[in-house]
Amino acid sequence: MKYFNLFSKKYKKVLAFDGGGVRAIIGLYFLRKLEEESSKSIFESFDLFIGTSAGATNALMLGMNGSKIEDLEKFWTTDNLKRIMNQSFIDKTSIFQTRPKYSNEGKKEILHNFFDNKKIGQSLKPVVVTAYD
């Protein structure tokens, strides 16, 4: 119910993020420039945030937390990426992929650090995310 005012405006500004780690990170450079040129935060500039896979993290950080681009850049640090994409020796050497590509332990810890125990319904603006494992 709290998002019905989204539909009262004639035009909606939607920001959609692609999946894939590199695409999720590259878009941040464009968004930083957009913030500088518009003198408004990305959170203020859009009505709805959408993301797939790694792009869903960006959408959630903006829509749920009202994060700034600097916060997203902190999420995508090299150290965090190493922890998110951690693979066991068996996963690295196996010719068959019988399990998820990456362990979820590091991912869960990092996501908890940025989102605590928030639920998507607690977002500050509407967010749509798609993902699969």
Give the positions of each predicted feature.
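Conserved N-terminal structural segment that caps and organizes enzyme catalytic cores in eukaryotes
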Residues: 115-117
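Patatin-like phospholipase
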Residues: 3, 7-16, 21-112
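Active-site gating loop/helix substructures
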Residues: 122-133
